[in-house]
């Protein structure tokens, strides 16, 4: 199956060969990323790519792929990490197999950065569901 207008990028991608986006970073307005800072105050910022060293970004991308494969992931997921700023050590926080999907959510923003429009992303995820 091939969704309209997705080109070669998806001919090679699928549940067994997932796309691993660049690393994104949430910079909350306050100390924590609360409901208010996410949806109301518009002061929090999303950085794509994350404002961390390229080596750390590659480490995070590698971990994200391993986590997705370890749970036999299909379709989409967002893998969240913490970074200890003092030691540059990366810690797994969670894998979210149904991440937020609004236009301001991190997952669609990361896919847009990868070159996949929101409507094309929806088409592709439907195709991946049928491939299961």
Roles of regions detected by a PLM:
Residues 31-33, 102-110:
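A short, polar/charged loop-to-alpha-helix boundary motif
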């Amino acid at each position: 199956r091939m969704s309209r207008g997705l080109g070669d990028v998806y001919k090679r991608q699928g549940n067994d060969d997932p796309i691993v986006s660049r690393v994104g970073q949430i910079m909350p307005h306050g100390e924590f990323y609360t409901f208010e800072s996410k949806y109301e105050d518009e002061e929090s910022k999303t950085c794509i790519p994350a404002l961390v060293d390229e080596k750390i970004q590659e480490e995070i991308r590698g971990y994200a792929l391993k986590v997705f494969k370890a749970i036999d992931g299909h379709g989409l997921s967002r893998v969240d990490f913490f970074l200890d700023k003092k030691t540059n050590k990366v810690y797994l926080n969670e894998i979210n197999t149904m991440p937020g999907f609004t236009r301001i959510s991190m997952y669609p923003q990361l896919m847009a950065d990868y070159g996949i429009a929101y409507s094309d992303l929806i088409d592709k995820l439907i195709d991946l569901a049928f491939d299961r």
